[in-house]
Amino acid sequence: MPSAVSSLRDPDELPAPLAALVRRADACSRADGEHLALGIEGGGLAVAMACGMALALEQLGLTQWLDVVYGTSSGSLMAAYVAGGATGDGERVLEDVCTREFVDFRRIGRSPVVSIDHLLAVVRRRPPRIGDAGRPQLRVLAVRVDDGRLLTLGPLTEAEDALAAIRASMAIPVWSGPAVAYRGEIYSDGGLIESIPVRTPLAEGASHVIALRSRDGAYRKGRRGRAYRTAENLVASRLPGELRRLIGERPARYDQEARNLESATVGTGPLGGRVAQLAPPTGTPLVGRLQADRDHVRAAVAAGRAVALGALTRRTA
C-alpha cells in the first residue's frame, strides 16, 4: 500500500490567523493587506515546546510569510532564530545549554542560578541571522524597571544590538541576577507583564497573531504557595523600581492572558477571530523553566512539532 503523506489543510478548515498564513504561502506573496505576527511565549527552557512548533511552521514553508515575530523572555531568543529562518539552530542551543554552567541551584546565595552569560556564549556559536532581506521583522518585549512599563525593543536589524535586547528581555528577576542595561535604560523580563506576545502585536498593527505556547492551554499559575510567596517576597523587596509589584501581580496577569487565549481558540472573547494559539494538549509533559535536562527538552520539541503538524496538515493516502 502507498504510504500516507502530509499536506497543508485547506485554509477554510483553519482559524483565521492560520488560514491567512497558509493562503500567503500558497500565493507566495504578502500582498494581501494583512499584517501577520507570530508571538512566542518564553518560560526558560519551557520554550522547547514552542521551538518544536516553530520548527514545524518552518518545515511547512510558512514562517517566511510572516510580517513580524515577537518574543518574550526566552521566547525572544527563539523569535530571533525563527525570524532568521534557522529555528533548528535554536533547538540545538536549547540542548547545548542543558548543563550546570547554565542552571545550577548550588549557586543560590552566591551568584545567579541562571547564567545568561553562558547562554549567550552558546548562542554566539550558532548566531541567529538578524535583518536578512525578505525575512520577518524581529521585535522583543522587555519591562523598563524604573516605571514598570512594557516596551517593544525593535525592529532589530543588527546582530549585537539584537542580542543585547534579547538579554534584556530574558533578565529574570531573582534567578538570573540584576536587571540589565539596553540603550541607556534598565530592563527586566518582559514576561512580568506580557508572557505571551499577543496584546502588543495587535496594538502595533497586526491584523492576526499566531501564539506559540510553551505550556498547555489550561495551564494556570494560580496563587503562589505561602512558603514560596514568603521567600519570593523577601528577595523581591530588595529589587529596584517596580519589580516587586510586578512579580506579585504576575500570576493573575498570566492567568488572564491564558483565559483570553483559550476563548480566542473557540472564536470568542476580545481576541476571537484575530488570534489563534498552538498549545499542547492538557497532560503533555512540560519542561520546567529551569529544568536543564536534555531528554526533557528533546521530548518537548518533538511534542510541539507534533502539535503544529497536527493543526496544519492532514494525512492523505
What does each of the following model-derived ranges do?
Residues 71, 75:
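Gly/Ala-rich beta-loop-alpha elbow adjacent to hydrolase catalytic centers
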Residues 1-70, 80-317:
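Patatin-like phospholipase
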